Design a protein with these regions (language model features):
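N-terminal twin-arginine translocation
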Residues: 23-32, 40-59
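Conserved beta-propeller blade signature
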Residues: 109-110, 153-155, 224-225, 277-279, ...
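N-terminal secretory signal peptides
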Residues: 1-26
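Loop/turn-rich, solvent-exposed surfaces of beta-rich toroidal or solenoidal domains
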Residues: 306-354
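Blade-level signature of beta-propeller repeat domains, shared across WD40, Kelch, NHL, RCC1
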Residues: 375-405
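Blade/loop signatures of beta-propeller domains
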Residues: 57-83
Length: 405
């Protein structure tokens, strides 16, 4: 089926797509929208350690007890929870949201956080702090490591939701304002290589269209695919130097199958080398959509009950964070889990959720068990198939390690 938005010259709609989905509404219930107060880089130099963290908050799942040491998961994919793995001194190395996680060639775990004290926190596999740095990326939302010519590079996605430096207190609803986001490529030690800004500069967005990117993936040939999941819901395709190629998606297609709703994450599926394609989360639809590398829609992976993020691949499986469960007709608070799918894109395990069930080949609605997570936002997998999970809106929780058993 041809996507009418898929070309290299066609501009996006003249008005920003309407965010009518309850995903966006729920996000705004938590995030305080308002006028932009200043540029991200001006804000970057403002440090506010006195109120950067609330260590008196209980960092527990909804069940109210620590899951440390418990065994979670189903079938061959079960894990022991190390709930204390990434904990640090919150007055020295604070986090707001553990938004993004990636592993470099040396096996270091790199976390991206939207703290105004440090945007990057670097761990070893034992949870020991190796480094913390950066304030230039106040809306840090996703981090990816790319191995290029024997060298590691960092791609950071700044989504534009930024801590308000003039916030009167540390209450969640008063902490944030929104501005445009951007993409940056860095050396592994944090030196800037280039940035990619608002698509209005390319003529593919109009000035009134929001741009708040949420994720990025690097294809085997070096091309970049960016999801504008908090903005106008397009996937934007660039070459390895950040030059525009095409875009597709949005919310105003004649064929609703081509729409994206809160397109939160993206990954390149290389499990079949002869059939590489993109998996793109349409989180508001509880769906992962399949596209060719040129943006042709190929089909959907429906994940009922799961407001799912982008895929992380390991071997024949992929792992995806679920930020909310759909329960009683709404997005349930503190209801996240991690879902794992096999090479046939069938769910084989839900970590922190109920066991997957298929009836006549159809996946039944999935949901949390409330025992482990609040809102799962990111996951990465090490060489031993252990998982590291970061969360959004989880009382400034550090990452959790899940040890494969």
């Amino acid at each position: 089926m041809q996507n009418t938005n898929l070309n290299t010259t066609q501009t996006a709609p003249s008005a920003a797509p309407s965010k009518s989905s309850h995903v966006d509404a729920s996000k705004r219930q938590f995030l305080h929208g308002g006028a932009t107060l200043g540029s991200a880089l001006l804000l970057a130099g403002i440090s506010n350690t006195s109120r950067a963290h609330e260590p008196e908050k209980k960092q527990l799942p909804k069940a109210g007890r620590s899951p440390h040491g418990s065994i979670i998961g189903h079938g061959d994919f079960q894990y022991k929870v190390d709930y204390n793995w990434g904990r640090l001194d919150p007055h020295k190395v604070p986090v707001e949201n553990s938004h993004g996680l990636a592993i470099d060639a040396k096996g270091r775990i790199i976390m991206a956080t939207d703290s105004d004290v440090n945007n990057f926190v670097i761990y070893n596999k034992d949870g020991k702090l190796l480094d913390a740095w950066g304030t230039q990326y106040p809306g840090a939302h996703s981090v990816k490591i790319s191995h290029e010519n024997g060298e590691d590079f960092i791609y950071i996605v700044d989504c534009g939701w930024v801590l308000d430096r003039n916030r009167p207190d540390n209450q969640w609803k008063n902490k944030w304002y929104r501005q445009s986001g951007f993409i940056a490529k860095l050396t592994i030690d944090g030196k800037l290589v280039y940035t990619i800004g608002h698509p209005v500069t390319l003529g593919i967005y109009t000035p009134d269209m929001r741009y708040q990117p949420t994720d990025l993936t690097v294809a085997p040939n070096g091309d970049l695919y960016v999801t504008d999941g908090y903005g106008s819901d397009f996937v934007i395709h660039y070459d390895s130097n950040g030059r525009y190629i095409r875009h597709w998606g949005g919310t105003n297609n004649a064929d609703p199958a081509l729409n994206l709703v809160n397109t939160h994450g993206v990954g390149v599926d290389t499990r079949d080398p002869n059939n590489q394609h993109l998996l793109v989360s349409s989180r508001g639809e509880q769906t992962i959509k399949k596209y060719s590398m040129q943006g042709k829609w190929l089909g959907d992976i429906h994940l009922p009950g799961a407001y799912v993020g982008g895929p992380v691949f390991k071997g024949e499986h992929f792992y995806a964070p679920v930020c909310w469960s759909h329960i009683d007709g709404k997005m349930a608070a503190n209801s996240g889990f991690i879902t794992i799918l096999d090479k046939h894109n069938r769910v084989v395990s839900n970590l922190g959720g109920l066991a997957p069930e298929y009836v006549d080949g159809q996946l039944q609605p999935m949901q949390t068990n409330y025992q482990v997570f609040n809102h799962c936002h990111c996951v990465c997998v090490d060489d031993d198939e252990n998982l590291y999970v970061g969360q959004w809106n989880a009382n400034q929780m550090y990452p959790i390690k899940l040890e494969r058993v």
